Amino acid sequence: MSNNLLKKKLRSALKLLSISVLLAVSAVNSSNSYAGTAIALGGGTLGYQVALSQSMSENLNLRITHNAASQSFDGETDGVDYDYDFEFSSTSLLIDWHVFGGGFRLTTGALINDNEIHAQSDINGLTLEVGDTVFTSAEVGRLEGDISFDSYAPYLGFGWGRAIADGFSVVFDLGVVFQGQPEVSLQTVGGTLSDNQLLLDEVEREEQELQEDADEFDLYPVVSLGLFYRF
């Protein structure tokens, strides 16, 4: 099964589960004093965020969020300069447990993780060292790569603030996404030696260097702030 097909199936399953849980929770909450729904706008290390929170009991809330953003920066790996483009896109289903009945809460859940990183070499000189061999920029063309992550990513964290409160409320989250070991692919594009086996071998060596740098993203820190409104 392809990665894109798996993501579509997981996303559909998450939507179906979310709708089912919300309907069930609404039925239960219709007879208690803790019924409530809140929507939010916010942002953090996963990007800009929209969220919907539904009370399940006095101290338990269901939260659905969608995060999206783009960010670019420059970096260097094994002597090669790269332009990196981060594409953030994720949808999460979370359970907030207000352990002591106040603002403090524990949060667990999972993300449908479409976060990706695109990389392209920034060749400023006449030569470029790929792996352990020096080539001319004309021979290499440019190096292009993609870094992808597990489609399903568990989340664990804690925070402060009650989404289901009177009127507006501010909530803070701090946690970790367990998105697994990244998968790196790298290729040479537009060079006179793009099909040369020596260059291809060195590109594979360069890919391994990128993989080592990307491995640190298996645990992704989450810090976010949101403004909720109960209606």
State the predicted function of each range:
Residues 1-36, 214-216, 231:
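Cleavable N-terminal export/targeting peptides
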Residues 34-36, 55, 103, 107-115:
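A membrane-pore/channel beta-structure motif
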Residues 39-41, 50, 58, 62-64, ...:
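Transmembrane beta-strands of outer-membrane beta-barrel proteins
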Residues 42, 51-53, 96-98, 159-161, ...:
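Transmembrane beta-barrel domains of outer membrane proteins
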Residues 45-47, 66-72, 99, 110-116, ...:
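Transmembrane beta-strands of outer-membrane beta-barrel pores
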Residues 57-59, 100-102, 163-165:
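Outer-membrane beta-barrel channels and translocator barrels
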Residues 66-93, 115-153, 180-218, 222:
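Extracellular/periplasm-exposed beta-strand and loop segments of Gram-negative cell-envelope proteins
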Residues 96, 100, 169, 217-231:
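Outer-membrane beta-barrel "beta-signal"
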